[in-house]
Regions:
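Short, compact, well-ordered microdomains
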Residues: 50-87
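A motif-centric signal for short, conserved binding hotspots located
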Residues: 1-59, 63-65
Length: 87
């Protein structure tokens, strides 16, 4: 998905982990991802050059950022989704 920062209007490439789209996320990040489950909770482990990131279900994986992840409530306030590229 293509998102833009509400403040700077910079393009952000991100995908939301919904608990079932492991192949989409793996293709998006270009590395192997691991699905972790415990009881009814599902997480995604993504390996990056900064180390492993644990993404909760509903969380976002963001390309080209040091943290590489974003919480749901932060994403809604900081970014907006667009269907077209705007530079």
């Amino acid at each position: 998905m293509i998102y833009h920062d509400r403040n700077t209007k910079k393009r952000i490439d991100a995908i939301q982990w919904n608990g079932m789209n492991i192949y989409e996320v793996s293709s998006f990040v270009g590395t192997n991802v691991t699905c972790l489950e415990r009881f009814n909770d599902t997480w995604l482990k993504v390996s990056t050059i900064f180390g492993s990131l644990i993404i909760p279900e509903g969380g976002y994986v963001i390309k080209h950022m040091e943290s590489g992840k974003c919480k749901i409530d932060v994403a809604g306030k900081k970014y907006f989704e667009t269907t077209y590229e705007k530079d």
